[in-house]
Amino acid sequence: GDRGSTISGGIKLATTTGLPEESFWTYSGRYETRRPSNWSEVETNAAQHKIGQAYQMQTYDGVRTFLGSGQGGISIGISWGGEVDRAIVNSFSGAGGGGHAIALLSLSERLDVSGRPYIWMLNSWGAQWGNAGWSEWSPNAVEQMLRHRYTASFGLSDMTNVKPREYTLDALKKDLRI
């Protein structure tokens, strides 16, 4: 039977085979274990969309910087429980639930009390889930998720030569005259 997948397996597929456009392999809203009948077209299209680099994401500032730079999106696997099954997530403990992979794709206009943006997360469960398939995660929740022992989080980019710089947003702000 099916045993699911891993973030590392998805990254390997994205770097070697590529990821097809959704129009070539549509998601029906239900789990399908068989390849579509147009498999050779899927492979040809996927080869045009390979990931060039994967960077481990370990901090909220790293997530914020990566998404804010427009380099790509973040593939994250977490322990999925009821606390994250909502349109706005403010905290995370990792209790109760199995593993689930989702994508962090953009900074939100919603800010926490420190002025840090929430992160937009896209789920695979369709538009009937959350806020039309999306959820906003607070900086606090993201930090808690990244510290959880079962979390795997990688920034994925089609840019092959980009290297992330190590710095904190607070340190950068000190050097700027804002």
Positions of PLM-derived features:
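Predominantly the structural core of cysteine protease catalytic domains
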Residues: 1-122, 127-178
